[in-house]
From Swiss-Prot:
This is Phosphoribosylaminoimidazole-succinocarboxamide synthase. Pathway: Purine metabolism; IMP biosynthesis via de novo pathway; 5-amino-1-(5-phospho-D-ribosyl)imidazole-4-carboxamide from 5-amino-1-(5-phospho-D-ribosyl)imidazole-4-carboxylate: step 1/2. PANTHER family: MULTIFUNCTIONAL PROTEIN ADE2, SI:DKEY-6E2.2. The lineage of its organism: Bacteria, Bacillati, Bacillota, Bacilli, Bacillales. The gene is purC. Signal peptide: none annotated. GO terms for molecular function: ATP binding; phosphoribosylaminoimidazolesuccinocarboxamide synthase activity.
Length: 240
């Protein structure tokens, strides 16, 4: 497998073409951003840790029957994935009130919900990634009704799997963001990453944060936090 030209560079990753059709080469960066890019920093080691954690979690989800784009980890900061066309929606699952939800609906941060809430956000930096209803999504033709239903069902299934996994590590899965894409056959797959960049994780007992809120709120050293999370997950080096 050969890495070829750069296709896209985002806030946290670079995406390269390869010499194999429908396979992409992902490189995780040592960059942290928050508040839609208003806060930025270089965090040495962050790319390696997010690559390790995402590779582990996507492998475990694959074993649990969740179709996703991950193929294998190929270096400390790189992985191979199946090429997909990203559906321009962020699917957010919330188990505990935190972050923007607390501000938006006025409930105290830390309030445990009786059942998970699934939200859809438009992936559009110019608009500030607004929250959308299903009617908005239909109006903008971002996804079909069946695709939305599938993504919601998969998000809740992934939530069940990850909640159980993190609970075994004495962590609460507060909320998390997913992205999905369509492969060359039109099949919808879980894509992007699942890492402490995209999840809120709290220690069950102390409520210590094990996620990017440490950077957002200047609560400590991000590399140390992500390292502790990987250690709790077992520090496994996983491939599909």
């Amino acid at each position: 497998m050969e890495k070829q030209y750069l296709l896209y560079e985002g806030k946290a990753k670079k995406v390269y073409a390869t010499n194999e059709k429908h396979v992409l080469w992902i490189e995780y960066k040592d960059e942290a951003t928050a508040f839609n890019g208003e806060k930025k920093a270089t965090i040495v080691g962050k790319g390696r840790l997010n690559n390790e954690i995402t590779s582990l979690l996507f492998s475990l989800l694959h074993e649990a029957g969740v179709s996703n784009h991950f193929i294998r980890k190929i270096s400390d900061t790189e992985q191979l994935v199946r090429q997909v066309t990203i559906i321009p929606l962020e699917v957010v699952v919330r188990n505990i009130v935190a972050g923007s939800l607390a501000k938006r609906i006025g409930l105290e941060e830390g309030t445990v919900m009786k059942k998970p809430i699934v939200e859809f956000y438009y992936k559009n930096d110019d608009l500030g990634d607004p929250l959308l209803t299903e009617d908005h999504i239909a109006l903008l033709q971002l996804a079909t009704h069946d695709e939305l239903l599938y993504m919601k069902q998969m998000a809740l299934r992934i939530n069940d799997i990850l909640t159980s996994l993190f609970r075994s590590c004495d962590l609460q899965l507060v909320d998390f963001k997913l992205e999905f894409g369509k492969d060359e056959t039109g099949a919808v797959l879980l894509a992007d990453e699942i890492s402490p960049d995209t999840c809120r994780l709290w220690d069950v007992h102390t409520k210590e944060k094990f996620d990017k809120d440490v950077f957002r709120r200047d609560l400590g050293d991000l590399t140390e936090t992500y390292t502790k999370l990987l250690q709790r997950l077992g520090g496994l080096s996983c491939t599909k």
